[in-house]
Regions:
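Hydrophobic/aromatic beta-strand elements that line small-molecule binding cavities or substrate pockets
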Residues: 110-112, 116-126, 135, 232
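Extracellular structured ligand-interaction cores
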Residues: 89-91, 117-121, 131, 160-164
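Short, intrinsically disordered, charge-balanced linker/junction segments flanking boundaries
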Residues: 224-232
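Generic short beta-strand segments
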Residues: 93-102, 137-139, 228
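Amphipathic/hydrophobic helical signal segments and adjacent flexible N-terminal regions
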Residues: 21-87, 100-105, 110-112, 131-133, ...
Length: 232
């Protein structure tokens, strides 16, 4: 069973409303575009979708047991945080939205927005008391048109190493992105990081992307990590 990939880390970390519409699952022409909905079908910037057909997925409709584990009685705040991070493990249907938001040339005609989707697995690759590493792996099945009308053959899976996120409790040394492919080591005092977790995000080749400190918040209906302001 697949989950919607809703990593609510109020930093926009893979954020976006993912919809359980059958038309999006099947990648037909009637996609529910997440960020480009304001362009209608007659607009020159009307959104477009993927040209391939993917594996049919069955979405979970009930909360996962990992969610309930976060709210067990008697847990410390740190243990709640750890369980929230570990709850990201699993199978997901993820959406990818590409849309130009900044124009550096005048005149300039932006490309039409594009949206596609895929299936992704999240695995913990390191777990200690103060450190958790989660590796994202794309596992894509493509439907190939068969000989008969409306007949499809499911091809072999395409497995792609995707991004990685490392979480460290009360981290005092950050590798902060400072723009133009440069990063700066930033030291923090132990007092300033009390109760906080750093999230370091890495590219598919394990090179750094960005890192930030933040605090987890746990409510009755959601858990969220709020990042401090940082370059991305």
């Amino acid at each position: 069973m697949f989950h919607l990939f809703f990593l609510v880390l109020i930093i926009g970390f893979n954020a976006g409303h993912l919809f359980a519409k059958n038309d999006q699952v099947n990648n037909t022409k009637k996609n529910q575009f997440t960020f480009s909905w304001q362009f209608d079908g007659t607009d020159s910037l009307r959104p477009r979708g993927g040209s391939t057909l993917g594996q049919d997925v069955t979405l979970e409709t009930e909360p996962d047991e990992k969610w309930f584990a976060i709210h067990e009685g008697g847990l410390t705040k740190k243990e709640q945080d750890r369980r929230a991070i570990l709850a990201m493990e699993g199978q997901y249907r993820v959406s990818f939205d590409f849309i130009e938001t900044i124009n550096f040339k005048n005149p300039h005609m932006p490309s039409r927005p594009y949206q596609s989707w895929g299936t992704e697995y999240v695995f913990p690759v390191a777990i200690t008391e103060d450190f958790i590493s989660l590796q994202h792996i794309m596992v894509m099945y493509f439907k190939n048109m068969g000989a008969g009308d409306g007949d499809f053959d499911m091809g072999k899976p395409m497995v792609l190493k995707h991004w990685r996120q490392d979480w460290k409790f009360q981290d005092t040394t950050l590798n902060v992105f400072s723009g133009f492919n440069t990063w700066t080591k930033e030291k923090k005092s132990p007092k300033s990081v009390t109760g906080k977790w750093s999230q370091a995000v890495y590219q598919v080749d394990d090179s750094p992307r960005y890192q930030s400190l933040g605090s987890w918040v746990h409510k009755s209906n959601y858990s969220a990590w709020r990042s401090e302001e940082t370059w991305r």
